[in-house]
Structure formats: C-alpha cells, structure tokens
Amino acid sequence: MTEMSMRNMTNLLPRLLSCLLAAVLSLSMSVAQAQSDDPVENPRVLIKTTDGDITIELFADKSPITVENFLQYVDDGHYDGTVFHRVISNFMIQGGGFDTELKEKPTRDPIVNESKNKLHNTRGTLAMARTSDPDSAAAQFFINQRSNLRLDWSGGKDGYTVFGEVIDGMDVVDIISLTDVGRAHAQTAYGPTVFQDVPAEPIVILSVTRLAP
C-alpha cells in the first residue's frame, strides 16, 4: 500500500467512527422513543363484597386526580368494611363512605371535579359521588347500573366524574341493585339524618385491593 493510500485511510477512519457512533445514537433514541410511546396499562382493582366480586379498570389517563385519590383510599384500607348504603334499581349503587352501622368514615380533603374529561356515565362505569358542589367528591363512589348520561358534563355544567368501568362482575352489580331497600338512620359528618334506599340487609365491601398489572 502506498504512502498516499495510508494517509487517505488515516483521514477516513475518524469519519467512519463518527458515522458509526451517530448511527448507534440514532438507534438508541429510536428505541427509547418507541418505548415511551407504548401505552401505559391502566390500574385495576378488585372489590370484594358479600354479594360477589367486581373488577374495575381505572382510567388513570383520563381522570388522573380522581384515580390517584381513589387508589390512596384503597391503599389506606378506607373501603374495607364499608357498605353500599344507597341502592336504586335501574340507576346505580353507591358506597365507600359508611360502615355497617351507617356511621360516616372520615375522609381527606375533597378533590377537583374532572368531568370535563368527557367520559360518559354509561352502564358499568365507576364515578365519584358528591354533593351539589362540583368539587366536593372525597371517597364515595357509585357504579352506574344503567346509562345515566344526564350525569355527564354538559354545556359548561359540571357532571359526575367517571374514572373507571367494570370489566368483570357486572352481574354482581345487577344483583345488588335488586336488593330490598328502605329508610335508615345514619350518622354523617354533619350530624344524624335519615337515608332513603338503604339495603335492608347490609351489602358489605369486604375489601378493595389493587390487582397486579
């Protein structure tokens, strides 16, 4: 090999190494981007009740504040031993706030309403219960036994935030909805009151736990 050829090879080598390094970096960035674009799997929880099990998928991507709040209550064991205290057939079942003696459990501060996520209160969806104040939801939730679109956000009017849906156990929801109900005395944070639509026999939420991804 001539001296000229050796010099050319010496000059070319850094360029080849630079091109190779650039290709490796580009490939690494592409792989990282592809991984970041992978959809994050929504968390799931199992609600065990005296009438059967209900599995829920939570919409962490659409209702992040509400899901985080709910999961904190789950992790704290807040729902264990509470009841479905309000059951209205062909409407919804509501629970997560009162023990078997209908005494309200203490909660953290309420959260902001996320009903602008435009998720609909269709049959089988999980939504936050609240008072007339849109930003008053804390721990109580309900499962829509039928589609209740009038509860949705509409025309600037806040609705009831949907943050999950039943993926297994809707038959249990239907069974609960058919239970005999009546009036019962309850102890709320604001004092004693009388509730309507309380199951004659308590339907207890034995536990709510996260499911492995």
Language model segments and positions:
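Short, Lys/Arg-enriched N-terminal segments with co-localized hydrophobic residues
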Residues: M1-M6
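Bacterial N-terminal signal peptides
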Residues: R7-N11, R15-S28
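Cyclophilin-like peptidyl-prolyl cis-trans isomerases
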Residues: S28-P213
